[in-house]
């Protein structure tokens, strides 16, 4: 398996709404990479896996960066759009912890953000939408975007230089 293309394929699946298949592709790469007995690799994603499942050439790959890009922008759905922050999660129910949370730490517009999705009903991708968003415990006004919400860059730029908690409550689509 050529890892770089497999990750890009997963990215495209997520981008076109095939969340279950995208998850399956990313999870297969991850499971193969962490199976040291078979892959004979230190943790990481190699350029490709041989027919025996052995990882080959860990230093000739952009797979890990594409994997992370896919996790941030597609799975967690955290990305920029014309300077504003868009939150459009595609997390599967099994990706939330026992309390129904999934958290990502990232940078956006020079601000350190802790994005915590709260899925109290343990809904699967496609079953939920963004209900409300809080920054540091305060409700904020968001613009609805297809499949998520948009937060104004200006609102984020007014925040002091610190880590800011974005609590994103997911609700069943109606």
What is each PLM-predicted segment?
Residues 1-3:
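Generic helix N-cap/helix-start motif at coil->alpha-helix transitions
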Residues 8-174:
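Non-catalytic C-terminal accessory modules of carbohydrate-active enzymes
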């Amino acid at each position: 398996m050529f890892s770089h293309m497999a990750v890009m394929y997963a990215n495209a699946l997520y981008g076109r709404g095939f969340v279950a298949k995208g998850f399956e592709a990313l999870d297969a790469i991850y499971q193969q990479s962490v199976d040291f007995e078979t892959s004979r690799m230190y943790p990481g994603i190699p350029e490709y896996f041989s027919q025996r499942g052995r990882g080959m050439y860990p230093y000739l790959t952009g797979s890990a960066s594409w994997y992370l890009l896919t996790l941030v922008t597609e799975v967690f759905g955290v990305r920029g759009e014309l300077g504003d922050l868009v939150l459009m999660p595609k997390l599967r129910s099994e990706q939330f912890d026992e309390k129904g949370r999934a958290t990502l730490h990232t940078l956006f517009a020079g601000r350190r953000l802790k994005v915590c999705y709260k899925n109290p009903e343990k809904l699967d991708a496609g079953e939920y939408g963004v209900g409300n968003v809080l920054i540091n415990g305060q409700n904020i006004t968001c613009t609805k975007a297809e499949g998520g919400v948009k937060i104004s860059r200006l609102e984020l730029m007014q925040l002091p230089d610190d880590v800011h908690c974005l609590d994103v409550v997911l609700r069943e689509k109606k």
